[in-house]
Regions:
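Non-catalytic interaction/Regulatory regions outside core domains
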Residues: 1-132
């Protein structure tokens, strides 16, 4: 699915089509968020028909933690290299975090997918968000 980068009247990128595009990659996708470098949610969508495993307050807190994790990982970029992505397997959900230049992409998906498919999803998400 292709999309155009839309800008609103304040010349800010409309992130809704990007988040929708991420969610459409696979039926196992549950939630997608674009987070600024301070941990504020710029845009987030829970896929229709899916129920959140966290409250909105917990989701916002988790996004702040994702941004903090990014800052902590950046401390090791010089010695270890940049982080390609973060992948967390939990009992009820898989969490993936990708780091474009100015935003952080956080997605959750059903854990049922095999590892090869999850790596394909990481690649697709990185490709769709490289400009952020």
């Amino acid at each position: 699915m292709a999309f155009h980068i839309l800008k609103n009247e304040n010349h800010k990128t409309n992130l809704v089509p990007i988040v929708e595009d991420i969610l459409s990659i696979d039926s196992a996708m549950r939630f997608a968020a674009i987070i600024d470098l301070k941990g504020n949610i710029s845009e987030a969508i829970m896929k229709k028909g899916k129920t959140s495993l966290k409250s909105q307050k917990e989701e916002e807190h988790f996004c702040k933690q994702v941004a903090l994790g990014r800052r902590m990982r950046n401390e090791f970029n010089k010695s270890l290299g940049k982080v390609n992505y973060v992948h967390i397997e939990r009992e009820r959900v898989t969490q993936i975090v990708v780091y474009p230049k100015r935003k952080t992409i956080y997605v959750t998906l059903e854990p049922k997918l095999n590892m090869e498919r999850k790596m394909e999803l990481v690649h697709l998400i990185k490709k769709k968000t490289a400009h952020l």
